[in-house]
């Protein structure tokens, strides 16, 4: 069992901890709790870089080793890092669990050392018709992020 964690930081009062676990070559389970967000859906992605020298802006684009267009987590055509949305309650908090087979913790496409990012707006899952739909899901600004690191 491989385990990883990302502690979210934000200049906007958002905080949270995201846990990643993977058994052998199976899918990765992502669980977490985030607080300080406005209610509603927020895009949730793994970005290519673990660079937070310029806050969340330096984490690069969505992790996309196959060079595909943006999509929903269940789509065949999607970035590996496209994890859809988290649905935040009226209290500004969300707890979630996601199982995904495109974000391994080991091997050449490992997400360890990359960043997880929470966006200001809903991810349209590549289906919104906006010019940014096929690249970012038109999910808006980056409100919180954290580097994914191995856990003991």
Swiss-Prot record:
Its EC number is 1.15.1.1. Disulfide bonds join 56-145. Belongs to the Cu-Zn superoxide dismutase family. GO terms for cellular component: cytoplasm. Zn(2+) binds at residues 62, 70, 79, 82. Keywords: Antioxidant, Copper, Cytoplasm, Disulfide bond, Metal-binding, Oxidoreductase, Zinc. Its cofactor is Cu cation; Zn(2+). This is Superoxide dismutase [Cu-Zn]. It catalyses: 2 superoxide + 2 H(+) = H2O2 + O2. InterPro entries: SOD-like_Cu/Zn_dom_sf, SOD_Cu/Zn_/chaperone, SOD_Cu/Zn_BS, SOD_Cu_Zn_dom. It comes from Carica papaya. It comes from the Eukaryota. Binds 1 copper ion per subunit. Homodimer. Its main location: cytoplasm. Gene3D superfamilies: Superoxide dismutase, copper/zinc binding domain (2.60.40.200). It is found in: Cytoplasm. Cu cation binds at residues 45, 47, 62, 119. Destroys radicals which are normally produced within the cells and which are toxic to biological systems. One of its GO terms (molecular function) is superoxide dismutase activity.
């Amino acid at each position: 069992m491989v385990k990883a964690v990302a502690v979210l930081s934000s200049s906007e009062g958002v905080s949270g901890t995201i846990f990643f676990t993977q058994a052998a070559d199976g899918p990765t389970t992502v669980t977490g709790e985030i607080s300080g967000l406005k209610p509603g859906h927020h895009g949730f992605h793994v970005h290519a870089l673990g660079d937070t020298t310029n806050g969340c802006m330096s984490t690069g684009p969505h992790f996309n080793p196959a060079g595909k267009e943006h999509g929903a987590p269940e789509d065949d055509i999607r970035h590996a890092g496209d994890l859809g949305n988290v649905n935040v309650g009226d209290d500004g908090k969300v707890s979630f669990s996601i199982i995904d087979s495109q974000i391994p913790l080991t091997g050449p496409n490992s997400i360890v050392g990359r960043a997880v990012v929470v966006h200001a707006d809903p991810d349209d899952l590549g289906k919104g018709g906006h010019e940014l739909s096929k690249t970012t899901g038109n999910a808006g600004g980056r409100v919180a992020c954290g580097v994914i690191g191995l856990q003991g």
